[in-house]
């Protein structure tokens, strides 16, 4: 009888262990991740996201594959709407910057509170760019030409933040540059090189290759001081040209659907903290493109994001008036 009881207890323990193992949830993530880029190929968000994916995979920071998907349009809103429509919010993340914050707010795709913050990564510079053989080799050339023929020169913009920059140039210089909205920096570059527009708004990573190749030329930087990023070391700032009010920095980070689980949020916050500590990020991206590295974890980024969004909306209201 004792032997029978002992045997039955052993069987019960074994069966319980099997069911316990089978019922335990596997650690997140258990399937592939889609990294959505709410912009066209070749733009600043595209360059950053693909580098992030490369760093994550090379350093084995995520056990699953990560696939990049470009969904440009609507100043980021098209990609954000695509993310919102996904049935499993834990497996889709997307890049965000100040311009796409404005686009998402205006379209209602990421209104206040309707997102999950993962990490802030850095702060980017903004450039005023033209074709390398353009007759407008300096900002003074451009201003003189537009004042002589108001409305005759166009500036390509990828988003509302770019349009704010153009509006502020017009206010500062008393000019009438015309802004034209495109889906991304890649499209703006094509339009400049094709002679369809004369200028464009770019982040350094978007223009670096074409400036280095001699196709484009940056003639002004929206900053207090010059950048050390190649090939923009000699680009003058609006501040040194007598317009310290023309200073813009673009924050860059990563968000997810508002319904993402806390487990997934913390996983990605940790992943991006590790990414930001790598040489590939610090040197291969930030130093190369003049980006100021600035990591904030998911909770700190949420507090920052809400306040930054309010400031951006105030600037956009100024543009609308």
Model-identified regions with their sequence ranges:
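N-terminal (or domain-start) structured segment
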Residues: 22-114, 162, 175-198, 203, ...
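Ligand-binding pocket segment of bilobal, Venus flytrap-like solute-binding proteins
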Residues: 152-235
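Residue-level signal for nonpolar/aromatic packing positions in well-ordered secondary structure
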Residues: 22, 33, 42, 68, ...
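An extracytoplasmic/periplasmic, membrane-proximal ligand-sensing/linker region
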Residues: 30-32, 262-321
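Hinge/capping helix and adjacent helix->loop/strand transition within the periplasmic-binding protein
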Residues: 82-92, 104-187, 238, 251-285
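Solvent-exposed loop/turn segments at secondary-structure junctions
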Residues: 41, 99-102, 134-135, 160-164, ...
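Short, low-complexity disordered leader/linker segments with a strong preference
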Residues: 1-31, 320-321
């Amino acid at each position: 009888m004792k032997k029978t009881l002992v045997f039955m207890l052993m069987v019960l323990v074994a069966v319980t262990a099997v069911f316990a193992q089978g019922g335990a949830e596997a650690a997140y993530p258990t399937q592939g991740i889609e990294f959505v880029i709410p912009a066209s190929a070749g733009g600043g968000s595209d360059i950053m996201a693909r580098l992030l994916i490369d760093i994550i995979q090379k350093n084995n920071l995520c056990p699953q594959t990560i696939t990049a998907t470009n969904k440009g349009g609507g100043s980021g809103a098209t990609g954000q709407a695509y993310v919102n429509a996904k049935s499993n919010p834990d497996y889709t993340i997307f890049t965000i910057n100040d311009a796409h914050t404005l686009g998402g707010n205006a379209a209602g795709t990421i209104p206040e509170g309707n997102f999950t913050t993962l990490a802030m990564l850095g702060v980017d510079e903004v450039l005023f760019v033209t074709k390398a053989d353009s007759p407008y080799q300096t900002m003074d050339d451009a201003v003189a030409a537009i004042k002589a023929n108001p409305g005759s020169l166009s500036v390509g913009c990828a988003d509302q933040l770019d349009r704010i920059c153009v509006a502020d140039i017009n206010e500062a210089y008393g000019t009438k540059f015309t802004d034209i909205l495109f889906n991304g920096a890649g499209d703006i570059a094509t339009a400049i090189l094709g002679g369809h527009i004369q200028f464009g708004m770019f982040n350094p990573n978007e223009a670096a290759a074409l400036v280095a190749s001699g196709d484009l030329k940056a003639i002004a930087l929206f900053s207090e001081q010059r950048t050390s990023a190649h090939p923009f070391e000699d680009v003058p700032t609006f501040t040194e040209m007598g317009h310290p009010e023309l200073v813009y920095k673009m924050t860059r980070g990563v968000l997810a659907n508002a319904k993402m689980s806390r487990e997934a949020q913390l996983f990605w916050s940790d992943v991006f903290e590790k990414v930001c500590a790598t040489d590939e990020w610090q040197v291969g991206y930030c130093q190369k493109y003049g980006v100021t590295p600035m990591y904030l974890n998911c909770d700190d980024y949420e507090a920052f994001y809400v306040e930054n969004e309010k400031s951006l909306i105030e600037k956009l209201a100024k543009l609308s008036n």
